[in-house]
Amino acid sequence: MKEVIMKKKIFLLTMIVGIIAVIGACKKSDDSTTTAACSSSLSTTASGTLTGMTSTMGVDNMTGTYNLAWYGATPTAGCIDNVTAVSSMINQSAVPSDTQNFKYQHIITSSTSFTELLTWYSDNNSCATVSGYHATSYTNFTVGDNITMATAPSGYPTYGTKVSYKDTCFMAKGVTDTATAFINAMSNVSGAVTGTELNKEGSGSTYYNIMALNDNHSGTTYDWFYLGPESTSAYPDNYSSDDSDVMYQ
């Protein structure tokens, strides 16, 4: 699980850089219409329900916020403060160098959308002092067929639901100068100013993936969410040990 999640973080960061490379060709932030459209479509407030995912209870729904399960653990409120984990993320340039804790979350924002949010914190072991964040909004969420697998990577179920969603909006903000420098170091991102939120149109790409739920997994009170390796060309037929996520709420 350690290697799975670490590789996924590298994959996500690479994907985000690719997204930004595309949106660099979009209208500049001084176009008020473009900025407003992006801002209005990117919410980090949980609202609504995504329906139709397969689960241990048959068909189930997703609502609220799901947090990354790091090293197989379920840290309080999703605050990942494992020193080894944070150090590894810094060494791989996946988070700013002043990061002490972080959260990686999927937030259901309507019946057809969700937001992927990575927040960095500069305080020690509490996730109280935000140093920065970046988020991507996905809309046009659509549920397809259910699938099963003969086997799946360790920690993942042998079932899933085909889903698709569109990359609509990207935003980022550095509260500390270190976080701002990290954002500006992303490919085709410039002009981020400490304390000011940067909003950009997304790539517009449609992604194909598989998702599944597992209620009260392993006798715990948590509901678990599994997200496969997304693609712009075809639905995956299984989860991946390199670039899939295990999340909980």
Where are the language model's segments positioned?
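Bacterial Sec-dependent N-terminal signal peptides
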Residues: 7-10, 21-60, 249
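N-terminal segment immediately downstream of the Sec signal-peptide cleavage site
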Residues: 40-76, 81-83, 103-108
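General secretory precursor processing signal
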Residues: 29, 39-43, 82, 130, ...
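Short, Lys/Arg-enriched N-terminal segments with co-localized hydrophobic residues
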Residues: 1-5
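Sec-dependent N-terminal signal peptides
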Residues: 12-16
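Contiguous, well-ordered beta-strand patches that form the walls/edges
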Residues: 71-78, 92-221, 226-249
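Short, charge- and proline-biased low-complexity linear segments
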Residues: 81-92
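Secreted/processed peptides and extracellular or luminal domains of membrane proteins
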Residues: 32, 44, 85-86, 133, ...
